[in-house]
């Protein structure tokens, strides 16, 4: 057997069987959705701590009643904190930057996977949705699915890539997010 490969056997065959190994696009899509969900949760926490507008809590429809109560207590307690504001800016910049992949400019941005902040309000001529200007990301799932079919290897490299051939990831969105967050979560 091959490590990391799952065989889905359908039944016995009297003829030779041809095996095709395909990337698990569904697992990749789920991992990307989970990453974006975690990013949005972090942005929500930063927004709650650094802003006083209670309406932002109402926009977070996934919060339980207890979480809403806690969020209201924490609302704005670190308003003006430069550390959190720098972190928010750093994370937003990281999500918007291009990263080197085998497909070049055809797959260099998270937006090309369907991951972006879409601040335009639906149907509003030139209007913006205030809630979407808080740094949250959205996923256009059809774009994500198509990118994972057409550019799977480059999409993988977009998140983590060895650009100098030393077999160590040194570039990519996940790599950059880790580097941006590391100073805030390390001990000491």
Question: What is the role of each PLM region?
Answer:
Residues 68-71:
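Gly/Ser/Thr-rich loop/hinge elements
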Residues 49-63:
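Short, glycine/acidic-rich hinge or "gate" loops at secondary-structure transitions
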Residues 1-46, 73-188:
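Bacterial flagellar/type III secretion structural subunits and associated motility module proteins
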């Amino acid at each position: 057997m091959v490590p990391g490969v799952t065989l889905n056997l359908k039944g016995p065959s009297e003829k030779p069987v041809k095996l095709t190994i395909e990337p698990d696009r569904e697992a990749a899509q789920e991992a990307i959705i989970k990453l974006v969900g975690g990013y949005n949760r972090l942005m929500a926490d930063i927004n709650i701590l650094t802003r006083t507008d209670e309406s932002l809590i109402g926009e977070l429809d996934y919060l339980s009643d207890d979480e809403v109560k806690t969020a209201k207590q924490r609302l704005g307690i670190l308003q003006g904190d430069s550390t959190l504001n720098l972190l928010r800016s750093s994370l937003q910049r990281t999500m918007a930057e291009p990263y080197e992949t085998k497909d070049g400019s055809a797959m260099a941005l998270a937006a090309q996977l369907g991951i972006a902040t879409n601040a335009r309000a639906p149907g509003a001529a030139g209007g913006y949705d205030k809630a979407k200007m808080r740094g949250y990301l959205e996923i256009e799932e059809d774009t994500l699915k198509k990118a994972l079919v057409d550019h799977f290897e480059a999409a993988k490299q977009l998140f983590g890539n060895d650009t100098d051939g030393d077999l160590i990831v040194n570039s990519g969105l996940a790599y950059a997010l880790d580097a941006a967050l590391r100073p805030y979560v390390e001990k000491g």
